[in-house]
UniProtKB/Swiss-Prot annotation:
This is Urease accessory protein UreF. Its main location: cytoplasm. Required for maturation of urease via the functional incorporation of the urease nickel metallocenter. One of its GO terms (molecular function) is nickel cation binding. It comes from Aliivibrio fischeri (strain ATCC 700601 / ES114) (Vibrio fischeri). UreD, UreF and UreG form a complex that acts as a GTP-hydrolysis-dependent molecular chaperone, activating the urease apoprotein by helping to assemble the nickel containing metallocenter of UreC. The UreE protein probably delivers the nickel. Gene3D superfamilies: Urease accessory protein UreF (1.10.4190.10). Belongs to the UreF family. Keywords: Chaperone, Cytoplasm, Nickel insertion. The keyword NADP does not apply. GO terms for cellular component: cytoplasm. The gene is ureF.
């Protein structure tokens, strides 16, 4: 049970790495009227969940977990590089590294030691941090993937509540509905071919690139 509680701590939007400060382009999409209500937000998030998390982050997370456990350092580093290469805007790459840097300071406090090989990976991408935590706490791949997806979803809904804006009840209802999609995303990720790993979310990429120069904004991405 303690391992599960530690995992819940890692995926919290407010703690420990400040995920709440990022919208991943959603702030600009709301500003420009692409997302104006709970139905449109659900569509936006569903596309990201099934066409990015399920086809990029979650498959790479599973691979990194296995490779780091086997001490296949070079292959693990290659997948960390791959994650960064798939962050298609400057602020998305910066977000990935900022979260990774925060995890590099947090993990040792949780008893997960980093060495000269794993530290640069964690600083590069938070995905490596989750993989190391999974090995340290003996988490199953399915539990790890579901938790990672839930942390992303909860943060995105919080952004929607603040900016669309949505009421708290509408936000909770959206979480309930989207939670039903997470098992589908996890299953998809577990059967996704290696040669197809990547994301296809052009609207998010455009929104993120425009958010970089948005005049007034609350979020860092």
């Amino acid at each position: 049970m303690l391992e599960d509680l530690r995992l819940y701590q890692l995926i919290s939007p407010s703690l420990p790495v400040g995920s709440f400060t990022y919208s991943q382009g959603l702030e600009w999409a709301i500003e420009k009227g692409w997302v104006t209500n709970v139905t449109e937000l659900k569509h936006w998030l569903s596309n990201q969940l099934m066409d990015s998390l399920a086809t990029l982050e979650l498959p790479v997370l599973a691979k990194l977990t296995q490779l780091l456990q086997q001490e296949e350092w070079q292959q693990a580093q290659d997948w960390c590089d791959f994650i960064i290469a798939n962050r298609e805007t400057k602020e998305l790459r910066l977000e990935e590294r900022q979260r990774g840097l925060a995890f590099s300071m947090l993990l040792p406090k949780l008893g997960i030691e980093l060495n000269q090989t794993t530290l640069p990976m964690v600083k590069q991408t938070q995905v490596a941090a989750f993989a190391l935590a999974a090995n340290h706490w003996n988490l199953t791949p399915t539990k790890l993937a579901a938790a990672y997806a839930w942390g992303w979803l909860e943060n995105a809904v919080i952004v929607g509540i603040k900016l669309v804006p949505l009421g708290q009840s509408a936000g909770q209802q959206l979480l309930l509905e989207m939670a039903d999609v997470i098992p589908q995303a996890v299953e998809k990720s577990q059967h996704w071919p290696e040669h197809l790993i990547g994301s296809f979310t052009p609207a998010q990429v455009l929104a993120s690139s425009r958010h970089e120069s948005q005049y007034t904004r609350l979020f860092r991405s």
